[in-house]
């Protein structure tokens, strides 16, 4: 049974049936579809478009279908065009011809737009919750490991930071991601139900009532816009892409830090794998997969942008292709956030190796230049002097703080005994605005 066909003389080909069907993926929307239908039926009865007893029969049937799907009794499968057809046809089979009144005053165009809005709202809230859990772990692990470590530019040791402060940089990125998603919820807060195919309905539909029942702030202002745009899907996948970019950057650093060349951290066994041939290997596959999966989400964004490009108003079948990219992007970002939270919460930090790396990198060179500036030298001159000191140290395989005062005075008479206190790593990180890094 199809929900259309009266004007056709010939049957749809099996090839076209299979090509046209979206049930294999839009079955994810069954909950939203049924909840939308429940609100629609209540509104129809309130507006005296259907009888009260008809409403009760339809509601009972819809609730039974939802329960049977949730319990695995009713499988979402078969030769149905989409999830809307599946629900409506099963409703008619369950309660009889009264089920045919479900679709009164409604099109699949506003129906699917509603389903996607509801699903997108729920998905956004799920991603926000995953972000919060990851941010909590970043703070907790950072506070537990507030050790001095090298900060990098160009992947070269640059200045001293702390492990905690480094993790907090990612906290700030994810905090902005959370804010972006919270802002996006505003655009998801308008209900398209009642827009019909594109031009509303001749029935006295109460769109405000259904919008309130379904948790929306208001109905959409324009019927055409309500059924024909998916900019909110594009926006969400764009925001998911930014989250994935941040996750990928963090993954790359965790991969580097866990390598034998760095040995700053050890990723837990629960988020690592081994080699089928090399017994000694412990591979950071969780982080590597997160880094790799960014391509999927970027691809999903390009896919939906391409689908919507140049589409005339209102609904076009092209828009059926909005679902798989969104479902994939949402599932991917959630799984990556959960795995990253697991990696962060179980990693071990090697305090000694962090400090060894600090001492090897002349990370107090800037502070040494600042010392000379405090003694009256112009910064550019101080920069040159300390550069020469670094060359001298490299030739001697020594650190700046290990040079004698006599050696330092070869470069400037401004050096005094207090240089050693000034360039001490633990002291310097608590000087000036650096105190904001919160080393304790």
Curated annotation (Swiss-Prot):
One of its GO terms (cellular component) is cytosol. Keywords: Amino-acid biosynthesis, Arginine biosynthesis, Cytoplasm, Lyase. Belongs to the lyase 1 family. Argininosuccinate lyase subfamily. This is Argininosuccinate lyase. It comes from the Bacteria. It catalyses: 2-(N(omega)-L-arginino)succinate = fumarate + L-arginine. GO terms for biological process: arginine biosynthetic process via ornithine; L-arginine biosynthetic process. Coiled coil: none annotated.
């Amino acid at each position: 049974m199809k929900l259309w066909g009266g004007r056709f003389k010939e049957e749809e080909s099996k090839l076209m049936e299979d090509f046209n069907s979206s049930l294999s993926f839009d079955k994810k929307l069954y909950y939203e579809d049924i909840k939308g239908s429940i609100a629609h039926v209540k509104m129809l009865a309130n507006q005296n478009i259907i009888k009260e007893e008809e409403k009760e029969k339809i509601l009972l049937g819809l609730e039974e279908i939802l329960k049977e799907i949730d319990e695995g009794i009713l499988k979402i499968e078969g030769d149905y065009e989409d999830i809307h057809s599946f629900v409506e046809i099963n409703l008619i089979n369950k309660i009889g011809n009264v089920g045919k009144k479900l679709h009164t005053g409604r099109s699949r165009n506003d129906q699917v737009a509603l389903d996607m809005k509801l699903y997108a709202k729920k998905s956004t809230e799920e991603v926000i919750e995953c972000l919060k859990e990851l941010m909590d772990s970043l703070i907790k692990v950072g506070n537990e490991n507030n050790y001095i470590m090298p900060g990098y530019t160009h992947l070269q040791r640059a200045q001293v930071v702390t492990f905690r402060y480094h993790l907090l940089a990612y906290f700030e990125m994810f905090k902005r991601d959370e804010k972006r998603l919270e802002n996006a919820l505003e655009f998801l807060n308008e209900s398209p139900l009642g827009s019909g195919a594109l031009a509303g309905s001749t029935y006295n539909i109460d769109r405000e009532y259904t919008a309130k029942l379904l948790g929306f702030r208001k109905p959409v202002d324009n019927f055409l816009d309500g059924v024909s745009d998916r900019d909110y899907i594009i926006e969400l996948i764009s925001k998911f892409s930014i989250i994935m970019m941040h996750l990928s950057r963090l993954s790359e650093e965790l991969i580097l830090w866990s390598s034998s060349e760095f040995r700053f951290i050890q990723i837990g066994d629960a988020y690592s794998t081994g080699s089928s041939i090399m017994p000694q290997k412990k591979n950071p596959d969780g982080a590597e997969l997160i880094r790799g999966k960014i391509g999927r989400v970027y691809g999903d964004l390009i896919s939906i942008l391409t689908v919507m490009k140049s589409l005339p108003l209102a609904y076009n079948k092209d828009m059926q292709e909005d679902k798989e990219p969104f479902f994939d992007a949402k599932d991917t970002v959630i799984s990556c956030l959960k795995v990253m939270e697991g990696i962060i919460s179980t990693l071990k930090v090697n305090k000694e190796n962090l400090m060894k790396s600090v001492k090897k990198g002349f990370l107090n060179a800037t502070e040494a230049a600042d010392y000379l500036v405090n003694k009256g030298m112009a910064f550019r001159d101080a920069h040159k002097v300390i550069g020469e000191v670094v060359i001298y140290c490299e030739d001697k395989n020594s650190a700046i703080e290990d040079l004698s005062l006599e050696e330092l005075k070869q470069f400037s008479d401004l050096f005094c005994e207090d240089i050693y206190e000034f360039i001490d790593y633990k002291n310097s990180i608590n000087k000036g605005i650096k105190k904001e890094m919160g080393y304790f």
